[in-house]
Each structure stands twice: as structure tokens, then as C-alpha cells.
Amino acid sequence: MANILILNGASRKNGNTAAIIKAFSEGAVSAGNQVREFYLQTMNIHGCLGCEGCSRAGKGTDDPCVQKDDMSEINKAFMSADVVVFASPLYFWTISGPLMTAADRLYAQLRSLGYSKFPRKSVLLMTAGGSDYSQAVRWYETFERNLGWTNLGEVLGAGKAKEAERLGASIK
């Protein structure tokens, strides 16, 4: 069983991204996994200050960031997550602003732990009316590679609920 953390960067709570997350989650739960989703659009998460306060926090601290906003809750869930799912509609050929902000803020947690010493598995779920996901996929693959994470799969495009469900069910 895996603990799966979903960072939902969609602006529409019941849009295409929500549909693909729902299918993925149903598959994951059917395989015995636990899923926790954060809908970032309604959360109060500020951008990274670049102050390096996190570098002075103790290793493995639940929340090493000096900013105390809703990211604190995500940081705590991140510590016990085996799989991190980045879910977003395609905005201006990349991931949404809320998802980028949350991903940037993971810096505090990863900085205090030592980047490559906190291996995770990850998934990318994206939807769009268009089809050019290349910039978003490059961001995701760079993020993973630099952290030493393992890509479990990508589902790119609306209307791919079955594919998302199969991916979720494949996680053990």
C-alpha cells in the first residue's frame, strides 16, 4: 500500500482535471492505496521568499519553512507520501500557477532533507484543449531527474479517465 499525495492545480473544482484525478484516485484506492488530495486554488500558499530559513531548520522537520500558511499542511502530508501526483490543466503551455507555487515551496522540505536523500515516486496528470504538453513534461522530468524520483507515468489530455484509472490501480 502506498500513501499518495495529489497536488491539484486546477482552477475549476469540477473540470477536466478533477475528472482525471477522480479516475486516478478510484484506481489507486481499488489497489489498496491511500489518497490525499489538496485543491490548491482555494489554499493560502505564498511564493518562496528565497530567505533560506529552511536551511537552518532541523532535518526531517515537518515544516521547515518560515512562512506559516497552508503549505504547512502539505509539507506534513509530503513527509509520509510515497507518491506525489502533480495534476494541472495546461496553462500557457505549462503547469498552472497554483501548482508551480506549491512545487516551489516543496523546496523548503527538500532542502532541509537533502534533495536526493528523499526519493519519491511521482505521476503527472494534465488536461487541455490543446496537445502541446512538451514544456510541462520537460518541467516535470527535470524536477524528477534532479531529485532522483521515479516517474510512474503520465496521463496527458482530457477524456483519458480509463488511462488514469489504470495508472492509479498499477500503484502498489
Predicted regions and their residues:
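N-terminal beta1-alpha1-beta2 submodule of the flavodoxin-like/Rossmannoid cofactor-binding fold
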Residues: 1-87, 93-108, 112, 152, ...
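Cofactor-binding loop segments of dinucleotide-utilizing enzymes, especially the Rossmann-like FAD-
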Residues: 9, 40, 126-130, 156-157
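Short, glycine-/small-residue-rich phosphate/pyrophosphate-handling segment
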Residues: 97-98, 111-154
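Short glycine-rich anion-binding loops that position phosphate/pyrophosphate groups of nucleotides
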Residues: 90-92, 129-130
